[in-house]
Amino acid sequence: ITWNDLDLDAVFDTVDHTVSVCGEEYLYTALRMPVTTTEIREERERLMKLFAENQKAREAVQKALLLMGKEKMNPPTEEIAVLMEAEPGEKGKYLLMAGIAVLGIGLLFVLPPLGVAVLFASMVGNGLMHGRESKKLESALKAFGCILRLQRTARELGKEKISGLEMYQKRLEEQEKQLRPITRKCRTLVNTKESQGGAANMIFAYFHTFFLLDLIEYSSVVSGVKSYEKAILQMAEDLGLLDFALSAASYRESLSYYCRPEFLDEKKAGCRINVEELYHPLLTHPVANSLYAEGGILLTGSNASGKSTFMKNMAVNAIL
């Protein structure tokens, strides 16, 4: 049975109550690759119960996750993958060409004709260099913005101690502090690009172009961010798990009734299945079915009697 056989795109749209791109990605992954580890399932259930019963925790976490958002945004893992594969560029060359521009300014006060010539050559050379190399920067800016949102969300989540989330808050706080050296540089690059427009900002942008400052900063960030990959991805996963649990708790509250699937060890419990009042989450007016069977069974019925729907129903509910 495949993802399309179970119409899991529609299932995803139905159960998706997430408010951040981290939670959206975590939910999609949870449907794509259901976990069999008891510890992970139990921790997810604990968080769902916490959010269902604790309004203060629910509102505090959701408020923080809204800072991350999910409009027109790629999943964090995709954005970070872009940075991991990005070429940092030739920082030494950028520094040399910026140094020549500074030298030209200095020569204006000693040998004006030579200074003008050096400045003109730097203006042309650095402009061409910036135009050619800035494509790398443009593709990385969204990833830098994603890192900044992750950090801002983690910082907001740590402002208020929430009972039951101490482990996540502590880990996110540690990761947020660990990322500060690199996020300062990310912020400089993002702010420079976002502030374009207006005479003062145009002068500021030209200043960065003339001295290749954003390319120098970009090279430093890309070279340094690779050592923070584990912390960034762990931060995205932790935030995603919290949003996922919030979403699942919200979805459960929208249902007339639900239960937790209980999976038994076949060697200990044998091959059996027991379901009561099972219904498909995509049907508006479903007819619930119950079944108890041990060993193999033969499911029969006339055409269009619901055999396939029942089998898909079993699979979808096992995943959910």
Identify the role of each PLM range.
Residues 1-305, 310-313:
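Alpha-helical coupling/stalk and coiled-coil linker elements that connect catalytic or binding modules
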Residues 316-320:
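Post-Walker A helix-loop "phosphate-sensing" segment adjacent to the P-loop in P-loop NTPases
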